[in-house]
């Protein structure tokens, strides 16, 4: 079926509303496509954007989250809640452990955290706690890259680490998108008045811009539905493939970069000449664990993203690599 008769947006406008807040207006769409695409993009924006969050904390003199610290007005629960509000951005790394030390009366804010050159805090004035004259606070904060919302108890079980006294595992909300809504209005092209205008209202925490968030969401949506493109050209009648020439799923021809793995995992795979998803799924778990710098955590990440696409490790492919497949 040809799609040439379908209208595509001719106009995309970005209307700034405030800091990290914008309305993105796209028109025209065929009637009904405003809701179809608006709802899909909204769900992806809320659930699937990659961001950064504090995941573990260790405070000097603190055994558990229900403790109090002498000279600190807030209890540990309030300090942890405030710490979750700090917006971190990591450049070219997937995790980092940061140190916060301060004593003497006054407010402790996000800018008091000691940062390496490749870590940034978007809201440096964010309050963490208040100290009295004799107050002192010292802590280590682990920040990680992730997606969606991961409860602390789930992370603690999945990582299978030896429990350290005083190590507090946090519920992590990685999403950089704070709010998303969409509206569908009427649009007109020449004599047609039954068209849709899609208005996306997006607010982020500053790690990414609203425009970049939409671009990422669109790429995720395209990647997820690309598997259906294999049905194109089949016509109304089913034609079985010619014997001896197995058809290759187009998803397997996509680069591993499309899996949106962490930088560490992606670099480990490329070092082993694994450039395409088809290369990856033919490796076994044991083979990947022998890869330098690729540990159990990276392996679990790879298995999860493959499972989301209906794939597993250790699969066998005939006629791989296909003729003409370019290697970097």
From Swiss-Prot:
Enzyme class: transferase
Any one Gene Ontology cellular component term annotated for this protein: cytoplasm
Taxonomic superkingdom: Bacteria
UniProt catalytic activity: RNA(n) + a ribonucleoside 5'-triphosphate = RNA(n+1) + diphosphate
UniProt-annotated stretches for the region Alpha N-terminal domain (alpha-NTD): 1-232
Region named Alpha C-terminal domain (alpha-CTD): 248-328
CDD domains in UniProt: RNAP_alpha_NTD
SMART domains according to UniProt: RPOLD (SM00662)
A single GO BP: DNA-templated transcription
Any one Pfam family match given in the protein's UniProt record, by short name: RNA_pol_L
InterPro entries recorded: DNA-dir_RNA_pol_insert (IPR011262), DNA-dir_RNA_pol_RpoA/D/Rpb3 (IPR011263), DNA-dir_RpoA (IPR011773), RBP11-like (IPR036603), RNAP_asu_C (IPR011260), RNApol_insert_sf (IPR036643)
EC code: 2.7.7.6
KW DNA-binding (keyword) present: no
Record keywords: DNA-directed RNA polymerase, Nucleotidyltransferase, Transcription, Transferase
The keyword Transcription is annotated on this UniProt entry: yes
Gene Ontology terms, MF aspect: DNA binding; DNA-directed RNA polymerase activity; protein dimerization activity
Record-linked HAMAP family: RNApol_bact_RpoA
Functional note: DNA-dependent RNA polymerase catalyzes the transcription of DNA into RNA using the four ribonucleoside triphosphates as substrates.
Subunit field text: Homodimer. The RNAP catalytic core consists of 2 alpha, 1 beta, 1 beta' and 1 omega subunit. When a sigma factor is associated with the core the holoenzyme is formed, which can initiate transcription.
Domain comment in the entry: The N-terminal domain is essential for RNAP assembly and basal transcription, whereas the C-terminal domain is involved in interaction with transcriptional regulators and with upstream promoter elements.
Similarity comment text for this entry: Belongs to the RNA polymerase alpha chain family.
Name the UniProt record assigns to this protein: DNA-directed RNA polymerase subunit alpha
Gene: rpoA
């Amino acid at each position: 079926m040809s799609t040439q008769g379908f209208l595509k947006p001719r106009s995309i406008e970005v209307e700034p509303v405030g800091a990290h807040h914008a309305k993105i207006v796209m028109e025209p769409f065929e009637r009904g496509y405003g809701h179809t695409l608006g709802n899909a993009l909204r769900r992806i924006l809320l659930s699937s954007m990659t961001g950064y969050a504090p995941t573990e904390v260790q405070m000097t003199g603190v055994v558990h989250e229900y403790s109090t610290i002498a000279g600190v007005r807030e209890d540990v629960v309030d300090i942890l809640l405030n710490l979750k509000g700090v917006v971190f951005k990591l450049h070219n790394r997937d995790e980092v452990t940061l140190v916060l030390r301060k004593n003497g009366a006054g407010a402790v804010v996000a800018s008091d955290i000691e940062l390496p050159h490749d870590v940034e805090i978007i809201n440096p004035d964010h309050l963490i706690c208040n100290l009295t004259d004799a107050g002192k606070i010292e802590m280590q904060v682990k920040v990680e890259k992730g997606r969606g919302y991961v409860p602390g108890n789930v992370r603690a079980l999945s990582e299978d680490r030896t429990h350290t006294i005083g190590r507090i595992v946090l519920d992590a909300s990685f999403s950089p998108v704070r709010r998303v809504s969409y509206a569908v209005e009427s649009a007109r092209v020449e004599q047609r008045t039954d068209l849709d205008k899609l208005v996306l209202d997006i607010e982020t925490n500053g790690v990414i811009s609203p425009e970049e968030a939409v671009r990422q969401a669109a790429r995720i949506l395209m990647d997820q539905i690309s598997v259906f493109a294999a049905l194109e050209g089949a016509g109304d009648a089913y034609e079985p493939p010619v014997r001896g020439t197995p058809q290759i799923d187009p998803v397997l021809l996509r680069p591993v970069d499309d899996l949106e793995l962490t930088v560490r995992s992606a670099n480990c795979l490329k070092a082993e000449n694994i450039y395409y998803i088809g290369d990856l799924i033919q490796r076994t778990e044991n083979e990947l664990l022998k890869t330098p710098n690729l540990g159990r955590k990276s392996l679990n990440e790879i298995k999860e993203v493959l499972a989301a696409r209906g794939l597993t490790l250790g699969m066998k492919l005939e006629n791989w690599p296909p003729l003409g497949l370019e290697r970097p």
